[in-house]
Amino acid sequence: MLLLHRAVVLRLQQACRLKSIPSRIYIQACSTNDSFRPQYPSLTFSGDNSSTRGWKVMGTLLGLGAVLAYQDHRCRAAQESTRIYTKEEVSSHTSPETGIWVALGSEVFDVTEFADLHPGGPSKLMLAAGGPLEPFWALYAVHNQSHVRELLAQYKVGELNPEDKVAPTVETSDPYADDPVRHPALKVNSQRPFNAEPPPELLTENYITPNPIFFTRNHLPVPNLDPDTYRLHIVGAPGGQSLSLSLDDLHNFPKYEITVTLQCAGNRRSEMTQVKEVKGLEWRTGAISTARWAGARLCDVLAKAGHQLCETEAHVCFEGLDSDPTGTAYGASIPLARAMDPEAGVLLAYEMNGQPLPRDHGFPVRVVVPGVVGARHVKWLGRVSVQPEESYSHWQRRDYKGFSPSVDWDTVDFDSAPSIQELPVQSAITEPRDGETVESGEVTIKGYAWSGGGRAVIRVDVSLDGGLTWQVAKLDGEEQRPRKAWAWRLWQLQAPVPAGQKELNIVCKAVDDGYNVQPDTVAPIWNLRGVLSNAWHRVHVFVAP
């Protein structure tokens, strides 16, 4: 049976007068609508010629059909290309039911029929649904080729309204009006201040997270700082000299590079809210990312200002240049012993993955503290000082602390708990997604694992039956020094699906080199701020019949 598009059948009937062609060919109009088929009865041809002649005729028809189909599409595309759509109209087409539309430059495309054919799978294409393709093509440069554009042209339905391409004017009274443009793939938890995470299917695509989809945690509006006038103030030690460092001054210090994973204390908080309500953003599994950072070592800069290790306890306090309308800036601190240890790798970073820091990630300078919770990696760094006590910032003293499940907002005493520094061992499943349908036969499971304090992940265990039986996943990633494992490990497991199984309860848990392991459930580690959420990660999927 030869299946041709309905439009091709019409054109073939018009151009070739199929009823008079000798051979035996059955042509059926292709349609997802069965009611269409009776309009095109079977066309049967017979004759005494050999099968060779029949195949020649079929080849001719196929070639002619392809040409006519292309010509028919070009005609339809030309007729529809004058249609003008607003950005709002495009954004309303985000599902197979409404149609999957995307925009590239000034053109609008309906890629609904192509979604299942997308080489990266429909889920990747759906990330761009209702919006522009450019940010995703920037991540996957292989798309920006002539044959890909030719393929995309087949799905053009119109043009984007020119007014939607004009940049909006900045409202100066809005403290967030000058925030940078963000990648549309990010899953937004808060617009003001901006907080967002990459979707899980993109998070573990690369060992090094691309800058545009690195998770973003902001507490205040993003400052727009001039690199030429920027100065970093380092308060000198008693008898030492305070420093006022420009970017060029920082570049004059020895440059160090280090791969570091940053994780928000609230990563996977959404799982704690399923136990009981907590205060905080509804982070899923994406408040974690990895980058290659470069800059001056904090210990070198502090030594230049006369600081050295002392026998009494001391803390290095950081103040950012982001502030609220009252002038209150974000602040945090780490122990002086960590800051002064060259092996700890604490950086005053000015590069991220070989590029100047993006604004959302601290341009022009931020602190990077390997193995420590993201809250201490102060961005837009403006001032560094050494104090006998930790920072008096709200975010150091009254936030980012863990408590017993029995503590509520009526009984909490923030002074009774230490500030979070190192984080516990963590892992999560990024593929497949919860609720997804997987093929029978074999399932591929992917995810990440990481532990704080430089502790290396030595094993990830995966279960398909909720934890009754386990298999060991394969670990990928850079080899790291013992107790200096600052970056995550990506992991993968290909496992057979048990015959007849209709559902899978997939679970993962990681073990670090201190043999710390994740707890099995959330309830015993629940706390009112929803931090330190590291129970076994669970994904429930269905198996295709």
Curated annotation (Swiss-Prot):
Cross-referenced Pfam families: Cyt-b5, Mo-co_dimer, Oxidored_molyb
Cofactor note: Binds 1 heme b (iron(II)-protoporphyrin IX) group non-covalently per subunit.
Region: Hinge, residue numbers: 165-174
Catalytic class of the enzyme: oxidoreductase
Single Gene Ontology BP annotation: sulfur compound metabolic process
InterPro entries reported for this sequence: Cyt_B5-like_heme/steroid-bd (IPR001199), Cyt_B5-like_heme/steroid_sf (IPR036400), Ig_E-set (IPR014756), MoCF_OxRdtse_dimer (IPR005066), Mopterin_OxRdtase_euk (IPR008335), OxRdtase_Mopterin-bd_dom (IPR000572), OxRdtase_Mopterin-bd_sf (IPR036374), OxRdtase_Mopterin_BS (IPR022407)
Essential cofactor(s): heme b; Mo-molybdopterin
EC number, UniProt record: 1.8.3.1
Membrane-spanning segments: none
Record's catalysed reaction(s): sulfite + O2 + H2O = sulfate + H2O2
Pathway: Energy metabolism; sulfur metabolism
SMART domains hit by this protein: Cyt-b5
Subunit structure, as described in the record: Homodimer.
Name under which the protein is recorded: Sulfite oxidase, mitochondrial
Organism name: Macaca fascicularis (Crab-eating macaque)
Organismal lineage: Eukaryota, Metazoa, Chordata, Craniata, Vertebrata
Gene: SUOX
